A protein has these predicted regions:
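Alpha-helical, largely C-terminal catalytic domains
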Residues: 1-139
Length: 139
């Protein structure tokens, strides 16, 4: 799963911008795609020639691998929202959490691996380390 390792590497060059900002409108979305594509191209071309084809494929694998990586990215955003709301930051993250919960439940229907992760681990999101240790010692 080289794509999982490389898919956000272009953010080293162009920075990490949250998806809602990137998708604020079609023009902004298109421009971000151009910036990220240029950064990816620059990274691939800066590698030794024997690695360039391999890196280019790692950035854009398509298929199931790309679907799984995107699902994991979405799930990571869901976890971030849950943690922020649990920490009292409901004003900034409450609406986003509602949207993310909807997205996660839709993805679970088509990606059984994500459903398994969610079923096994979501109950612990937002718990303290002590609470997690107590929870796991009682099983």
């Amino acid at each position: 799963m080289y794509h999982a390792l490389m898919h956000d590497a272009q953010e080293i060059i162009c920075g990490d911008t949250i998806t809602p900002t990137k998708r604020a409108n079609p023009t902004i979305n298109a421009e971000f795609k151009k910036i990220e594509a240029a950064a990816t191209h620059q990274m691939v071309k800066s590698a030794p020639p024997f690695m360039q084809d391999f890196l280019a494929k790692a950035f854009e694998p398509g298929g199931r691998e790309q679907t799984l990586v995107k699902a994991c990215d979405t799930y990571a955003a869901y976890i971030k929202c849950r943690l922020e709301v649990a920490a009292g930051n409901k004003v900034e993250f409450g609406d986003a959490l509602e949207r993310m919960e909807e997205s996660v439940h839709l993805m679970i229907e088509s990606i059984p691996e994500l459903g398994r992760i969610h079923a096994d681990f979501s109950h612990g999101i937002g718990l303290s380390v002590d609470a997690l240790l107590d929870l796991n010692s009682n099983q």
